[in-house]
Amino acid sequence: VFTAERYKGNPLAVVFGADALSDDEMQMIAIEFNLSETIFLSAPEHVSHSAAVRIFTPGGELPFAGHPTVGASIALAERQHGEDADIDMVTVLAEKIGPVRCAVKLKPGAASFAEFDLPKLSRRSEEVIAREKLADALGISPSEIGFENHVPTIWSAGVPFAMIPLRNLAVAEK
């Protein structure tokens, strides 16, 4: 998210004071920003939380995303302590998947740092992915997908993603 080098970061919109915004307004703002994610911060409902958050892409709401979690936590730390602060602190963001604890380090003249703990681990879905459909989408042969006991699977810790093992590195280079 953040970097000490110009044009090297990953843009993120962080909207403070979103308590009065409706779902539709948040979605329209995310569409207007047209970034990969926009995170909206509201007053927390629980005293141990730093903020309640909602994460939107131009296409819809996400229950969790790492990029905005890190960005919002650093923005909260900078807002609370100033951009030139030299601190280590912890934020707790109330996200759709549950409370997300995020450790933040701010150092003057250096890129900010944050890391988080997920409230739940990724789980494998029972859904089966047809190799033919994957192969067609990837422009490869179905026989180039999977090897030994490694087969395509879907996982999720809030946002589903596919794990697609390829037969070898040459397939990935196509």
PLM features: what roles do these ranges have?
Residues V1-A65, V70-K174:
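Active-site proximal loop and beta-alpha junction motif in alpha/beta enzyme cores
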